[in-house]
Design a protein with these regions (language model features):
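Charged, gly/pro-rich active-site loop segments
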Residues: 92-151
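Short, Lys/Arg-enriched N-terminal segments with co-localized hydrophobic residues
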Residues: 4-21
Length: 151
């Protein structure tokens, strides 16, 4: 029984550290306000500004509309990269995006960004949220060594 208790403590410490690292990425993207999401369409890179980042059920989420080209690009290739700059530092996040079609996930995003409610609704069939999976974030600057965060 003691081994199981030790395992639970280890798991909790791992989960705590993972969430702490993920929060650092969340905080950076929130502070930047705008980040750039890169996808691929065929052999052509596509980059556009985004502004939504939300933590829901221990995962980082972004939001778009199903009618947008970015949605179709992610469906073909869910590997994306995000880049943002603020306060003399920049972040690059390489990850896979996984769609979460649950109303609760969409509602959480729209509650965090009420200004989007004029264009989106969790029940509209267009609102789309994705969470980041297998993410590696690198925070860099010209004055310090890069910090690598995996979540």
């Amino acid at each position: 029984m003691k081994a199981n208790a030790d395992y639970v403590i280890f798991f909790d410490e791992y989960t705590f550290e993972r969430r702490k690292m993920m929060k650092r990425v969340y905080d950076f993207l929130k502070k930047a306000e705008t980040y750039y999401l890169a996808t691929v369409e065929g052999d052509q890179p596509r980059v556009r500004p985004f502004g939504t980042i939300n933590e829901f059920e221990g995962k980082l989420y972004i939001q778009t509309g199903k009618v947008k080209p970015v949605s179709h690009q992610i469906a073909v290739n869910p590997k994306v990269e995000i880049c943002a700059f603020t306060g003399g530092e920049w972040i690059r996040v390489a990850c896979e995006l996984v769609e979460d079609d649950r109303i609760e996930a969409k509602k959480s995003m729209l509650d965090a960004y009420p200004n989007l409610r004029g264009m989106y609704d969790e029940n509209d069939g267009n609102t789309q949220v994705f969470y980041m999976k297998n993410a590696t974030a690198t925070i860099s600057s010209f004055t310090s060594e890069p910090v690598v965060i995996e979540f």
